[in-house]
Amino acid sequence: MPRNRCGFAVLMLLLLSAPADADRLDVLEGKFAFNWHAEPSREKCIKVTGPLLADFKSTKYRCDLNAKSNTSSGASARMCTEAKGRKEYLIFDTLRACDDERKTQASNE
């Protein structure tokens, strides 16, 4: 019986922590992103809202909310990677930072 209680407690902990992780991703709302695994010259920076934000919150993506400054332009960015690995979004605080990075990467194609 104690083993069942322990398993139940672990299950409840996992279920309760999932919404908290999704809520953490709300910091991405209103930021700007592009998929750098595609051709940057064909991509556009898009605002992280609605369906894209919902995708980031789902199990389709894994997001690293720690800002990294190892981008081509030197701007700080967060990343959300598709579980399948085909897409990886660089997420910037401003449209200008997003466009600068996209253009820098496009010039290196």
Language-model segments: residues:
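Bacterial N-terminal signal peptides that target proteins for export
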Residues: 1-8
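Post-signal/leader-peptide non-cytosolic segments of secretory proteins
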Residues: 23-109
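Hydrophobic helical h-region of N-terminal Sec-dependent signal peptides
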Residues: 8-14
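N-terminal signal peptide c-region/cleavage motif recognized by signal peptidases
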Residues: 17-19
